[in-house]
Amino acid sequence: MRWWDVEPVLGLERVLFPEDAWSAGLFWSELAHARGPGATRRYLVAEAPGDGGGQSLVGYGGLAAVGGTGDIQTIGVLPSWRRAGLGARLLGELLATAAEFGCHEVMLEVRVDNAPAQRLYERFGFTRIGMRRGYYQPGNVDALVMRLENPAAARTPSPPGPANPPDSVNSSDSSPTSTNPPQGTKTHG
């Protein structure tokens, strides 16, 4: 994710998480830790060809990595792009990043009422380890805590959905890395 991605990501964030969307300040703070030799964050965006020949944001994701533990901070996919494998691609890129950062485990929280996301994480090998009561506010929704040990060995499942996911996923400091990118979309950091 680059500075010019913050506004489009905020727009999608508000659509996806209307009750507890991240603020611009929070994204800027995260991006401040995504550069340089001491970087502890990586944020990705996925884009598809938009109207008028430009690119349109269709997804994003972020990881924090400190002390050998990675934490999936966020993953969001435009509703019309769900079940196309984009969430799996973003998650796979974030797990590869966790391995690059030397993480021995990756943690995340997911809403207890978000069964599709839970299934995605379980397909990658995440296990349920706990619950955070009232974690998501203001709705007072509980969070399921999940963990993946050894992200370097994580299995990357095949996407369950239709074709046409993004061509590539780019991070905050790299170029597209997919060896078999789907047609029509690109990602960048």
PLM ranges: what are they?
Residues F101, R119, R123-F124:
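Structural motif
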Residues G25, M107-E109, E122, T127-L144:
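Conserved catalytic-core motifs of GNAT/GCN5-like acyltransferases
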Residues G85-G87:
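Conserved G/P- and acidic residue-centered "switch" motifs that form tight phosphate/ATP-binding loops
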Residues W3-W4, P8-R82, L91-F101, E149-A153, ...:
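Acetyl-CoA-dependent GNAT
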Residues V77, R111-V112:
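Short amphipathic helical patch at the helix-1/turn junction of helix-turn-helix
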Residues L91, D113-A117, G134-G139:
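Short glycine/proline-centered loop/turn elements that form peptide/ligand docking sites
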